[in-house]
Amino acid sequence: MKKVTLQEVKPYQAPKHFNMVALRLHGKEETGAQRFWMGMSHFLPQGGAEYDASPLEKIYFVLEGEVTIQPGPGKEEITLGPWDSIYIGPNEGRAIINKTNRPATMLVVINYPD
């Protein structure tokens, strides 16, 4: 077991993300987790992530605020509020945007590639 406190985690720059701060809470280097990692993303108003797809599974869980998931052309946007979550399967594309004027905080769980 390894406890992690918010004070000890360090921010990192998530690729293709903007106007946000990412914190890695658990992972190989942080706690020895071998199959997945967990992070916390703080999105400023109009912050988000560019459209991207990867072969990894993702779970997003909104703690505070609101984020909009944009699955791509012709697909309906999905808005997540506090305590809402979404599973994004391998190779499913998505963009993320905080369309509000309030910050949003989201937990992120992603598996490591095999």
Where are these regions (language model features)?
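Short, conserved beta-strand element in jelly-roll/cupin
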Residues: 40-44, 54-69
